[in-house]
Each structure stands twice: as structure tokens, then as C-alpha cells.
């Protein structure tokens, strides 16, 4: 590939990457995509970023991997239950482990511009539907 990137399957990626950033939708196929086995394949120096959806990374398995230093660190702005409850394992890490983790709220879509774009695109799709035109990003 021209930019120097390599195509890799998930298992090879987990074993070799220094930073793994997850960006997949939540579906039957991606629930717990990253769990005990996958975290065990990662290098102890690896950092996991979940920018996908809650449920893609098993939070209990991630907390255990962090507590046992199986991986170096993690960051996420999504949780299996949002907002996360007080018993979420990522909110109950030891003080030392918590220093290796960035947890932020999932608020990317709460800007004025995001809402404006959402309403404009929604209205355009409604008009397109009734005019027999293509509905953009249609999910059946």
C-alpha cells in the first residue's frame, strides 16, 4: 500500500500493533469483539482505544487486562451501558491502574453543528422519499 500501511487480519494486528483503535458498528458479529482472548494476544506495551460502540470491547476483560498489566493502557468514550453505572469495572480500577486509562463521555454528537446537520439531512431525506429520489444512508 502506497502510504506504508499493511493489510492484516485481526489476530496478527492484535499481536503486533502498539496502538489499536477500534472503529466498528455494534452488531451480533462485533459484540465482545475484543475480550479475554484478544486482549491476551496483545503486547504488554499496547494501548487499546475504543472509539466504536459500547459492547464491542468487553469491559470486565479490559479492566482485568489493565489491572494485570497485560496491556499498557486504554481509552474509551463508549460504554456497554450509557451513562455507565457505578459498578462498571472501568470505573472501579485501582488507583495505579486508573492512571493508565482515559474515560470520556460519548458526546461527539451533541454540538449545535451536529444537531443542525442531523435535522437538515433528515429533512432532505424526507423530501427525497416523497419525491421518489434516493434516500441517503438508508438502513433497511
Residue ranges of predicted features:
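Rossmann-like dinucleotide/phosphate-binding beta-alpha-beta segment
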Residues: 1-44
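A generic structural signal for short
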Residues: 27, 50-51
Amino acid at each position: 500500500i502506497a502510504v506504508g500501511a499493511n493489510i492484516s487480519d485481526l489476530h496478527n494486528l492484535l499481536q503486533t500493533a502498539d496502538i489499536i483503535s477500534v472503529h466498528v458498528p455494534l452488531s451480533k458479529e462485533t459484540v465482545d469483539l475484543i475480550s479475554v482472548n484478544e486482549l491476551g494476544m496483545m503486547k504488554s506495551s499496547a494501548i487499546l482505544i475504543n472509539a466504536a460502540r459500547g459492547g464491542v470491547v468487553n469491559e470486565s476483560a479490559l479492566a482485568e487486562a489493565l489491572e494485570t498489566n497485560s496491556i499498557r493502557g486504554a481509552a474509551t468514550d463508549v460504554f456497554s451501558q450509557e451513562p455507565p453505572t457505578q459498578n462498571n469495572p472501568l470505573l472501579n480500577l485501582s488507583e495505579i491502574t486508573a492512571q493508565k486509562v482515559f474515560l470520556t463521555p460519548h458526546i461527539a454528537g451533541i454540538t449545535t453543528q451536529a444537531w443542525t446537520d442531523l435535522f437538515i439531512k433528515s429533512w432532505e431525506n424526507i423530501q427525497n422519499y416523497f419525491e421518489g429520489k434516493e434516500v441517503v444512508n438508508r438502513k433497511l
